[in-house]
């Protein structure tokens, strides 16, 4: 089977001491899409053929090149003193055969900072690409943001106990025009007194900005256990199918 390659943007915030040089994203030399294409190799007598198209890695890189600095600034300009903010983000594009981008979403994110994630989406929506090869395609680009501050991570059981049934408060953010997304990963940071410090979202479908704006306010008002002098990071699921 053919193995997909990835365009990787690595971003980090500077440490203490003298002002660090402004971080610059590093782009791999061989970016590609994460879309299956026709495969001539047989496995146990079966030939697998996928009718979807795929993106030329050079087309993806050319489309992203004008926006790498803006993606960096989404993180650095919104970080403030929250040096514990960091994580892995995967941006996902759906693109028509003529090169028109039809959807952009956060396929993955444990960054836990909706203002930064929203900024990344806004920049990603500005990117323009040449047409795919052999029809409609989709592709993903991972980004990594390195946290410098100290924090503790709560496991799934701890996270579930901490949040309990409070995520029902996010239901109020759904409207007739903006329905609630499904299978959403909610990442939270908890600080002194059990106060939520930051929250972010990712999902298998497009999460409307208006819903996420509302949900972020609701999530930041949740009552959570006190991590006692630490910043704790946790992730829970919302509306899983």
What does each model-identified segment do?
Residues 10-12:
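C-terminal motif of bacterial Sec signal peptides marking the signal peptidase cleavage site
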Residues 1-8:
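Sec-dependent signal peptide recognition
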Residues 14-241:
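Charge-biased low-complexity segments
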């Amino acid at each position: 089977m053919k193995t997909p390659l990835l365009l990787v943007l690595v971003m980090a915030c500077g440490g203490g001491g003298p002002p660090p040089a402004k971080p610059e994203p590093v782009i791999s030399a061989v970016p590609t899409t994460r879309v299956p294409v026709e495969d001539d190799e047989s496995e146990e007598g079966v030939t697998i053929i996928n009718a979807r198209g795929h993106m030329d890695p050079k087309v993806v890189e050319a489309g992203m090149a004008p926006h790498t600095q803006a993606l960096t600034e989404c993180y650095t300009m919104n970080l403030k003193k929250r040096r514990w903010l960091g994580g892995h983000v995967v941006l996902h594009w759906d693109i028509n055969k003529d090169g028109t981008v039809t959807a952009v979403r956060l396929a993955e994110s444990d960054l836990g900072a909706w203002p930064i994630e929203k900024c990344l989406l806004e920049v990603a929506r500005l990117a323009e690409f040449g047409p795919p090869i052999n029809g409609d395609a989709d592709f993903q680009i991972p980004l990594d943001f390195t946290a410098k501050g100290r924090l503790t991570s709560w496991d799934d059981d701890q996270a579930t106990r901490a949040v309990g049934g409070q995520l029902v408060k996010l239901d109020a953010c759904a409207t007739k025009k903006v329905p609630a997304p499904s299978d959403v990963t909610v990442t939270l940071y908890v600080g002194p007194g059990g106060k939520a410090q930051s929250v972010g979202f990712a999902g298998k479908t497009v999460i409307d900005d208006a819903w996420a704006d509302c949900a972020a306010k609701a999530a930041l008002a949740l009552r959570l256990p006190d991590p006692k002098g630490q910043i704790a990071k946790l992730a829970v699921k919302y509306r899983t199918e």
